[in-house]
Amino acid sequence: MHKQGVKLTSLLALALLVASCQGDRGGIIPATPSGQVEVLGAIPHAGTAWTEGLIVSEGSLWESVGGIPGSEVRGLDRETGAILWSVPNGGAFFAEGMVRAFGRTYVLSYTEGQSYLFDRDAADPFEPFASYEGEGWGLTAVGPHLINSNGSSSLFYRDPDTFEIVKTVPVAYDGEPVPDLNELEFDGKYVWVHQWRTPSVYRIAESDPSDVVRYELPPQVCPEGYPNGIAWDGELDLFFVTGQKCESIWKVRFH
C-alpha cells in the first residue's frame, strides 16, 4: 500500500478508536473518575478557628479547633453557625481530628503522639487514652474500627479499645499516591478525606479502596484559608464543609 493509503487507513483507525471511547457524555471517558460539587448554601463560621475535625452529633455540629494555646472542642448550631458551647484544653496539646463512636468521643493530638477521650461534662474533659507513633491528623470510624490519617498517603485502621493498628490502606488516584491526607468522614458507604492545602476531596469506597473519586471544591468554599473539615449529616442528606481560617461553613452535595 502506498504512503497516502497507509495514512488514510491510520486516520480512520484512530477515528474509530476515539469513537469507541465516547459515550453519552460526548467525550473521552477518563481513566479515573472525577465528581461534581453542588453548593447549597452557607452559615457563618469563626474565621479565627483552625478547624481540624468536624462532625454532626446530637443535631448540632461538633468542631475540634487546633492551636497552642487555643485548642478546644466546641458545639455549633447547624442552622446559624452560633457557638453553643466551648471546652478549651488549657493548652495541653494541639487538637486534631475527632470522632464520636463506640460510646466515646476520640480526639487526636498533632505531634504529641497521644489520643484523648473527650467528655465536656467531666472534671477532666480531655482524658488521655492511648499513645501512637507519628502525627495525628484526621479521624473517623468505619464498622468495628477507627481510621486515622497522618499526612501521608495511607489510612490506618485501628482497634477502638487499644488504638493499635489493624491494617494500613494506601490511597492512590490515577495511579499515583495521594499525599497529605487530612480530615476524614464516613457516610456509611464511603470514606471522605480532604487533601491538605488543596481544594481536593477524595471519596474512597470502603468496600474497595481502589475505587477513588476526586472532587474539587469551588473557589467560593474557604477562599480565606485551607478547606479542612467535612461532616456528613444523614438527616439533612448533605455535607458540611469548612476549614482552617474559613469564615463560612458550606452545605454541599457531591455528585
What are these regions (language model features)?
Residues 22-25:
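Bacterial signal peptide processing site
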Residues 38-44, 82-88, 124-130, 167-176, ...:
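A short beta-strand motif characteristic of beta-propeller blades
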Residues 46-58, 91-101, 132-143, 148-149, ...:
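Beta-rich, blade/repeat-based domains predominating
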Residues 17-20:
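C-terminal motif of bacterial Sec signal peptides marking the signal peptidase cleavage site
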Residues 115-174:
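Hydrophobic, well-structured mid-protein blocks that either form specific transmembrane helices
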Residues 77-81, 119-123, 159-163, 205-209, ...:
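Short loop/turn segments that connect beta-strands within beta-propeller blades
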Residues 81-118, 125-138:
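Blade-loop segments of beta-propeller domains
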Residues 62-68, 106-112, 146-152, 193-197, ...:
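Conserved beta-strand positions in repeat-built beta-propeller and related beta-rich domains
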